[in-house]
Amino acid sequence: MLKSSKKEDSSSKKNQDNKLIFIVRQLFYLIKHLFSKTKTPDNFFGIIKRLKINSKKMSLDECNILANLLQLENKTVEDIMVPRSDIVAIKLTTNLAELSESIKIEVPHTRTLIYDGTLDNVVGFIHIKDLFKALATKQNSTLKRLIRKHIIAAPSMKLLDLLAKMRRERTHIAIVVDEYGGTDGLVTIEDLIEEIVGRIDDEHDQQLDSTNFKVINNSTIIANARIEVELLEEIIKEKIKNDDDEFDTIGGLVLTRVSSVPAIGTRIDISENIEIEVIDATPRSLKQVKIRLKNGLNRDSFNLT
């Protein structure tokens, strides 16, 4: 009996591995197809069909990837872009030595935008490894020489088209511009990949991102300031936003109650039941807030863990 059990476990593991290999292989085919010069709709949907046929044997994660792929065709740049208010960028005239110190302290990303004059005139981006290489070799270099090119995308551009364009242009960053040519936001290659495989955490990521929150207890929630107010309303079962209000996010809600970005530790009464405390912010934007509910959460509306 013991030998039979081991054999069954081995067979089960082998089948699971085969499923995973199939999914990964099809994903690679799909991505390769997106970048192919001879791609046809039949090839694209043929791969999707093969994935769907095997969906009954997929794990939850694999099914999520398939669902993301099916939804990707209808998503646009505007759906996933980092808004202008959250963009971290550096002036073209910045000294390299000063820039290295600034990046160590303030910039949590490996790629940083460079602008000339204003953020509406982005000239490219630098990779942190290029900067430190120039400093280590004591090259008489300027910031301008380290700049890598970016591409331009409209908010309405399809994500599949942007992914293909990034590959053709061999760049990892796209600047999103509005109808007047102003900078509206940015999208990175990591943003696109995350739309397919889910969130990718690295050493610079915080615990929370723009799509989630953390319930601390029955009366406390920690949330990213970019979470939409409608989601919070759904969770706490309380109306916060009026039809004529011009904000969409929790951060926007807070800013309508104060004249400027509040300092960390500031507490703001939103209603008789809701108090919001700022727990992370920069001089220009809110990052993270703590939401206190005096009446507590409705346990029937949210699964507390």
From Swiss-Prot:
Gene Ontology CC terms: plasma membrane
Protein's GO biological process: killing of cells of another organism
GO molecular function ontology, one term from the record: toxin activity
Annotated disulfide bonds: none
More about this protein: Confers a hemolytic phenotype when expressed in the nonhemolytic mutant of Proteus mirabilis.
Homology family: Belongs to the UPF0053 family. Hemolysin C subfamily.
Protein name per its UniProtKB record: Hemolysin C
UniProt organism field: Rickettsia typhi (strain ATCC VR-144 / Wilmington)
